[in-house]
Amino acid sequence: MNLQHHFLIAMPALQDPIFRRSVVYICEHNTNGAMGIIVNKPLENLKIEGILEKLKITPEPRDESIRLDKPVMLGGPLAEDRGFILHTPPSNFASSIRISDNTVMTTSRDVLETLGTDKQPSDILVALGYASWEKGQLEQEILDNAWLTAPADLNILFKTPIADRWREAAKLIGVDILTMPGVAGHA
């Protein structure tokens, strides 16, 4: 089972405060473990423009049609001070990993320098932190019914309203997650 370029969808019974009702985009999955980014947990009061200001990055030349007021996500509980940018190609940045034909993860400053300009990738998601699982840990959590899995969908990853991503990701595999046991008051 290789879950790279898949979503992990938290089951309703998963009550961990970070992973409750989360959708995790799996960036890497191999025999050593897995690494992913939570894509539906916005950090309070932190937008992309705020990250650029903190890093003293000024988009040049500024393309006013590109919105920089999108929220930054809590990507996971590890390295919460480190940025991870999921985006569509190109992948010609200093530190990029191609996850699929249409998805790239970049951790270098040069991608941030394109934000708000005509050189910005067409779709972006900025996160601080990541989630990881040791060898066999994720597979066991799936067997323990902590997660559903679904092939990743770029519309959900980049365009679906954040509050709807959990439910929409489950719909990819025909599940209405709000009617599952463990979701009180939504049946």
UniProtKB/Swiss-Prot annotation:
Protein name as it appears in the record = UPF0301 protein YqgE
A Pfam family cross-referenced in the UniProt record is DUF179
GO cellular component term, pick one: cytosol
Encoding gene per record: yqgE
Task: Check the record and name the NCBIfam families matching this protein.
Answer: PRK00228.1-1 (NF001266)
What does the sequence similarity comment in the record state about its family? Belongs to the UPF0301 (AlgH) family.
The organism sits in which domain of life? Bacteria
